[in-house]
Swiss-Prot record:
InterPro entries: Ribosomal_uS14, Ribosomal_uS14_bac/plastid, Ribosomal_uS14_CS
Keywords: Ribonucleoprotein, Ribosomal protein, RNA-binding, rRNA-binding
Listed GO biological process terms: translation
Any one GO CC term of the record: small ribosomal subunit
Gene Ontology MF terms in the entry: rRNA binding; structural constituent of ribosome
Role description: Binds 16S rRNA, required for the assembly of 30S particles and may also be responsible for determining the conformation of the 16S rRNA at the A site.
Subunit architecture: Part of the 30S ribosomal subunit. Contacts proteins S3 and S10.
Family matches, as Pfam families: Ribosomal_S14 (PF00253)
Keyword Ribonucleoprotein set for record: yes
Protein family according to the UniProt entry: Belongs to the universal ribosomal protein uS14 family.
Protein name per Swiss-Prot or TrEMBL: Small ribosomal subunit protein uS14
Length: 101
């Protein structure tokens, strides 16, 4: 089980990234738009730098829904590999069977 503080910190980052998603994407698009003047692009970059660090979506870490483990994460199930294997062996994940050939 991951530390509760790490899980809570990540949840806080998710909320902040979601709150600033529109503004962040508009500024990023303006900063990368080659048709704009160089000064306008620079202004967009400076405004992006003024946003809170946790508003950046790359700071959000995918974590297991059951344990909070950050590594070995399967997006389709939102579980880490250990919990996925455990639940699949118990038959609690529909459509997942043990491989046999």
């Amino acid at each position: 089980m991951a530390k509760l503080s790490s899980i809570n910190k990540n949840e806080k980052r998710k909320k902040m990234a979601k709150a600033y998603a529109g503004k962040y994407s508009r500024l990023k698009a303006a900063a990368n738009d080659k048709s704009l003047d160089e000064t306008d692009r620079l202004v967009a970059r400076l405004k992006m730098a003024e946003l809170p660090r946790n508003a950046n979506p790359t700071r959000v870490r995918n974590r297991c829904a059951l344990t909070g483990r950050p590594r070995g994460y399967y997006r389709k199930f939102q579980l880490c590999r250990i919990q996925l294997r455990d639940l699949a062996n118990k038959g609690l994940i529909p459509g997942v069977t043990k491989s046999s050939w």
